[in-house]
Amino acid sequence: MSTHANHPFHLVDYSPWPLTGAIGAMTTVTGLVQWFHQYDNTLFLLGNIITMLTMYQWWRDISREGTFQGLHTIPVTLGLRWGMILFIISEVFFFISFFWAFFHSSLSPTIELGMVWPPIGIEPFNPFQIPLLNTAILLASGVTVTWAHHSLMENNHTQTIQSLFFTVLLGIYFSILQAYEYIEAPFTIADNVYGSTFFVATGFHGLHVLIGTSFLLICLFRHMNCHFSSSHHFGFEAAAWYWHFVDVVWLFLYISIYWWGN
């Protein structure tokens, strides 16, 4: 029986990566729980290595299928677009839960918090120092990633590389400043609901910045190897959508937690 069919859809081959990815994720979570209970972090590191290797090889296969084998046809790309859109929508609701927790606690502070917000004993960050600089950095990175998209659409190879490089650089700079802010923070995640909501919301956003930076870095390497064209570059578009989503979430974080919540 022939495995070929007269349709435009990509029927993927058998792959070990979903299995190894599941093993890596389970090992990582198990190792993290062990680490929390003062055990060795070896299992956690092993899980991360398995997961990273799986991600690299899985994405390598997808890049090969879409770039060299021509398997990402227009209907397949349309399905990928809808998948990315639904993924970003799910991420929106993920962050809505953190904003809900923050506003629930700040708009009706309990007696245990002294019925004030920020709670007694909490010294919040000055919103016009590092947080404002981080806002400017992410807004600038949104401009550079749009510059990269327009350059790619115009087949300007050099400017696409330059703008993607600046975007990745700004993402790394943001992460460094966020790490410095955490180190210098006058409160911790254990300091009542303010510390919990602050570090969980900004921490998950910081994780998304790291993911987005990695996403754009891969796009930079792929573009340097001529994987993208002006008409076939959904991998880059997905990274740009994700990065703009990260920008918008940060604006809400800055306005609600750093500025209004202060």
Curated annotation (Swiss-Prot):
Its EC number is 7.1.1.9. GO terms for molecular function: cytochrome-c oxidase activity. GO terms for biological process: mitochondrial electron transport, cytochrome c to oxygen. It catalyses: 4 Fe(II)-[cytochrome c] + O2 + 8 H(+)(in) = 4 Fe(III)-[cytochrome c] + 2 H2O + 4 H(+)(out). GO terms for cellular component: mitochondrial inner membrane. Component of the cytochrome c oxidase (complex IV, CIV), a multisubunit enzyme composed of a catalytic core of 3 subunits and several supernumerary subunits. The complex exists as a monomer or a dimer and forms supercomplexes (SCs) in the inner mitochondrial membrane with ubiquinol-cytochrome c oxidoreductase (cytochrome b-c1 complex, complex III, CIII). This is Cytochrome c oxidase subunit 3. It comes from Aedes aegypti.
